[in-house]
């Protein structure tokens, strides 16, 4: 079954919520995207005479017809909170201080009329200048919060927490064992690794990139675990797998999970405990800095495919940092843009 929520779209310009659009929605089962398209075209009355590469199978298509609905999913599917646009001001066309600046976005329904040559040039307005000046912000009040417990004896080791549900109160007991200095050090020294905390049986780990496979060698020194200097494999790296856009385009969840299993094997071979991947942001532009790390412009496809790849990686005992799932679209000047 497919949740009805999967058929919704975010209406950024009118309602500002997730909507069910009026009309027919088609679901099909097929071996690949081409066969899926042919199935739906067949339901619409098309044949190979209309340019299809092969006849589709109308019996494999389910059609659901809806009236326009901007109410049912005006609250978040998972939390029940009101759906609001947090970043409307990032759109020049909706930013109140844009002045005469406008941007024309590409549209598949009017491709020739919306493709504009050259880079978009914007003129600085006074309000834009004022809004981008960094200002001090008041820290939120700590009223109502309790200082955490540190260094409380409990005799729990990290391995005891394997498989314990995230909401289990045993985690509170486990965390209360740690001292302030231990927590400060693990936070301050966490770039592509985590430090050891011997008192709870936590080893030092190597956690490294990336979304297309491991980037480090199985070698001496800082790259991976140490090996014999005469080991003929010491400078070998793991496989670089196809970029995530290509992986998602297969729409083959079983194959994607197998890719994850292979990445997990490579990660163990390179001495990884954790992988800085996968990339969960969505494609907003072909010129974004991390397009190769992300799966799709479709959030549903991104989530479904990534889940299977993550399951594959973690089946080998390698934990996954699902990273860059929001606000990471630009590499140029990335350190200077807030």
Task: Please place each PLM-identified region on the residue numbering.
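Terminal connector regions
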Residues: 3-86
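Glycoside hydrolase catalytic-domain context in secreted enzymes
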Residues: 1-10, 21-28, 33, 81-338
């Amino acid at each position: 079954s497919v949740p009805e929520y999967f058929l919704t779209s975010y209406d950024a310009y009118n309602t500002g919520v997730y909507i069910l659009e009026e009309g027919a929605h088609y679901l099909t089962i097929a071996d690949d995207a081409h066969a899926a398209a042919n199935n739906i075209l067949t339901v619409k009355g098309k044949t190979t005479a209309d340019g299809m590469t092969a006849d589709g199978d109308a019996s494999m298509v389910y059609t659901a017809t809806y009236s326009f609905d901007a109410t049912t999913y005006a609250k978040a599917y998972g939390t029940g909170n009101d759906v609001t646009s947090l970043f409307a001001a990032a759109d020049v066309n909706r930013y109140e201080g844009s002045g005469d600046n406008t941007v024309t976005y590409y549209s598949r329904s009017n491709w020739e009329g919306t493709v504009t040559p050259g880079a978009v040039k914007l003129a600085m307005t006074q309000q834009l200048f004022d809004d981008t000046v960094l200002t001090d912000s008041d820290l939120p009040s700590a009223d109502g919060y309790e200082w955490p417990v540190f260094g409380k004896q409990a005799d729990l080791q990290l391995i005891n927490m394997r498989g314990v549900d995230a909401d289990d109160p045993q985690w509170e007991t486990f965390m209360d064992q740690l001292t302030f200095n231990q927590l400060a050090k693990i936070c301050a020294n966490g770039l592509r690794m985590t430090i050891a905390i011997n008192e709870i049986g936590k080893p030092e780990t190597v956690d490294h990139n990336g979304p297309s496979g491991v980037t480090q060698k199985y070698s001496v020194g800082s790259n991976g675990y140490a090996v014999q200097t005469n080991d003929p494999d010491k400078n070998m790296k793991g496989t670089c797998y196809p970029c995530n856009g290509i992986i998602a385009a297969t729409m083959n969840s079983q194959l994607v999970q197998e890719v994850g299993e292979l990445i997990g094997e490579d990660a163990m071979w390179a001495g990884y405990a954790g992988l800085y991947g996968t990339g969960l942001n969505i494609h907003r532009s072909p010129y974004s800095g991390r397009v190769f790390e992300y799966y799709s412009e479709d959030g549903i496809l991104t989530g479904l495919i990534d889940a299977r790849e993550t399951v594959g990686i973690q089946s080998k005992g390698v934990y996954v940092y699902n990273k860059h799932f929001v606000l990471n679209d630009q590499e140029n000047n990335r350190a200077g843009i807030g």
